[in-house]
Structures are given as structure tokens and as C-alpha cells.
A protein has these predicted regions:
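A generic secondary-structure signal
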Residues: 69-72, 150
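N-terminal Rossmann-like NAD(P) cofactor-binding module of classical short-chain dehydrogenase/reductase
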Residues: 1-3
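Contiguous beta-strand/loop segments that form the cofactor/metal-binding neighborhood of enzyme cores
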Residues: 64-65, 77, 82-86, 91-236, ...
């Protein structure tokens, strides 16, 4: 079963699918609340069904090569990561003509709401759900999870140690509630050793496309550019600066990460790219072999934790952490969401 419904429905439909004995491909985000994340994770582990999450970078050759390169040790310790996803598309996630035509009798509104509190029918929330919480968080649900998932994959870390976020609706004041511009800052590292780690800065805007989609991993020796698929010494320690401190130059040898990119198209009507088709193919192969797929349930759970932390940072304005014992998000020192 392929589940590509509204963001808030993914986990609920996934639970129903695996409990009914079906293997499932579940689009991202796996879940944007911790209760849904825990429910789908439990259901998959208890049923043993093959579940692939739609974070398709895990099935792209260039990202797989990047993971191997970092694991080899040649790159050195990650010191920072920069991620962007910028578009300039006023109609992104908008369907005004269809909204105008839709009537409640054309839908099963109560079924659509699932486990959300009841509210009166709203055609915008049915069709343009990505613009409205709690149906979606917008940018974090749709785009951030793709990119932050690579951090977990490349490092083996389960989730951020902390998240802060800022942003707003700065241009597209069309009745939406989810931000059109945001920046989130993540602290990553061993959960039991605060002396080690690195920062991830994620920024996204829907108001100007300069910068496009980028993921830049930095070490003291250089940069891993997953947009250009290059390993370079850019930013690495130069001899002139290291010499005064008794240090040698540390600059990576520049070369291509992979001859051919398996990247992801950020367009609104991109069709099927190599990464997506590869992710579906990997799932189908694992349905036959019963092996663990590339974007397995634990990967989905990890990106859901990072997503829930980010949503809490957006909604609370607080610094957000994660209570591993309780498997709950903490904002400003208290469990989130507030009861």
C-alpha cells in the first residue's frame, strides 16, 4: 500500500495498513506529533511489516556516497551544516479554483479529520492543508524533514539535542497560518557528551528562490556540497593560518562526489526523479526479500522527533529539547504540547 494522503494522516493510515497485514510506503513526514510517531513505530515493530518512508535521499547514489565518505573518516568531524530550500512560487500549495468549487457533500469531512478535533468544513483546509496547522506545519513537514534526515543518516545520531526557530508570514498574506519564511537552528552531537557536536542551520523561504535547495556539510578540512556533488577544500584550514598555532594545513583534495547526481527536483510539478523511483524500487525489493529498506521506520521516527521539536520551537518561541526517557518534546523546560 502506498500512503500519500495529507501530512497529518500518514501515521494514522500507516497504522491501519500494517495492522491489516499490508506492507506500506508512507510518504513523509511519517508523523508530526509524538503520539502519532509512537503509534506508527509501535505498529510496524509489532507486525514486522516492511515500511519505507518517503525520504528518498536515502536511495540516491550521491547521498549514499556522501554517507560512505563521511564514515571513512577522511572528511573529519562535522563542524557545521547549512541547509536551504528556497522557492518563489505564489501558487505553491494553493488550489484556488478547486477550493472555489469544492462542497462539503463532495467529501467525507469527518473521516478526513481522523483524530483531529472536529471543526466546521473548510475547503481550504481540505485541499490546501499544507498551509494550516494542525493539518501540516508547511515548510518543516514538507521540506525540512528531507534534509534533516540526512544528518541522522550520515552521523547515526537519533535526533537534535536542541532546536530554536524564528520566522513568519512575510509576503504571502493569503489567509494561510503556516510561515512562508523560517530558520531553525539545531544543536547535534552525542546525547551524553556536550563537549562534542556541531550546529545545523536550516533556512527556507517561499518568497525568493535565490539559493535554491542546498545541503553543505563542513569539516575543518573543507566542504561536502550535495547540490554540486563536490568534495572541496573550501573553508579548510590554510597553512598561513595554522602555522602560527603550530598546526599544519588541513584542506581536502577537491573532486567529484559522484559522476552522476541522484538529486531531488524541487519543482512543484517535478514528476519522478531518480531518488524517488529508487526509493520505491528499494521498498518493492524489500517487500520480496523481507529485508530492512533504506528509509526504515526508525529513520522515519527520528525525522519525526526532529520535526516535532521544530514545530514546538515555532509554536512556543522557546528553546526545545527532547526527553529520551519519556520520548516527549520539552519546550522551555515543560512537556510540549501543553495540556
Amino acid at each position: 500500500m502506498i500512503i500519500a494522503t495529507a501530512d497529518f494522516q500518514h501515521a494514522q493510515h500507516g497504522v491501519a495498513a500494517v495492522r491489516a497485514g499490508k506492507d506500506a510506503y508512507i510518504e513523509k513526514p511519517l508523523a508530526h506529533t509524538m503520539s502519532d510517531a509512537q503509534n506508527i513505530r509501535r505498529a510496524v515493530l509489532e507486525t514486522g511489516k516492511v515500511v519505507q518512508v518517503g525520504t528518498q535521499r536515502r536511495s540516491a547514489a550521491n547521498y549514499q556516497r556522501a554517507k560512505d565518505f563521511i564514515a571513512s573518516g577522511e572528511f573529519g568531524d562535522i563542524v557545521s551544516v547549512e541547509m536551504t530550500w528556497n522557492v518563489n512560487q505564489p501558487g505553491r500549495w494553493r488550489r484556488p479554483a478547486l477550493v472555489e468549487k469544492l462542497r462539503e457533500e463532495d467529501t467525507d469531512w469527518k473521516l478526513f479529520l481522523g483524530n483531529l478535533p472536529f471543526e466546521a468544513f473548510d475547503p481550504r483546509k481540505y485541499i490546501e492543508y499544507r498551509l494550516f496547522w494542525p493539518y501540516s506545519s508547511g515548510i518543516p513537514d514538507q521540506w525540512m524533514v528531507h534534509q534533516i534526515d540526512t544528518v541522522h543518516w550520515f552521523t547515526g545520531l537519533p535526533h537534535p539535542r536542541s532546536v530554536t526557530a524564528n520566522g513568519g508570514i512575510y509576503l504571502w498574506r493569503d489567509g494561510r497560518k503556516n510561515w512562508d519564511t523560517m530558520t531553525a537552528v539545531f544543536d547535534y552531537g552525542p546525547l551524553n557528551d556536550a563537549t562534542k557536536g556541531f550546529q545545523v542551520v536550516y533556512s527556507s523561504r517561499q518568497t525568493n528562490s535565490a539559493g535554491d535547495v542546498k545541503e553543505l556539510y563542513h569539516s575543518n578540512g573543507g566542504t561536502l556540497d550535495l547540490d554540486k556533488n563536490l568534495i572541496t577544500g573550501e573553508g579548510g584550514l590554510e597553512e598561513s593560518y595554522g602555522k602560527a598555532m603550530g598546526m599544519k594545513a588541513n584542506q581536502l583534495r577537491s573532486r567529484a562526489l559522484l559522476e552522476k547526481s541522484g538529486g531531488v527536483d524541487s519543482g512543484a510539478h517535478a514528476g519522478v526523479d531518480e531518488a524517488t523511483s529508487g526509493n520505491v524500487r528499494n521498498w518493492m525489493e524489500c517487500v520480496r526479500s523481507r529485508k530492512m529498506p533504506n528509509a526504515h521506520i526508525e529513520a522515519g521516527y527520528s525525522h519525526s522527533v526532529a520535526l516535532c521539536m521544530t514545530i514546538a520551537a515555532i509554536q512556543s518561541g522557546e528553546r526545545v529539547t527532547f526527553d529520551d526517557a519519556k520520548q516527549q518534546v520539552v519546550a522551555g523546560g515543560a512537556l510540549w504540547p501543553r495540556l
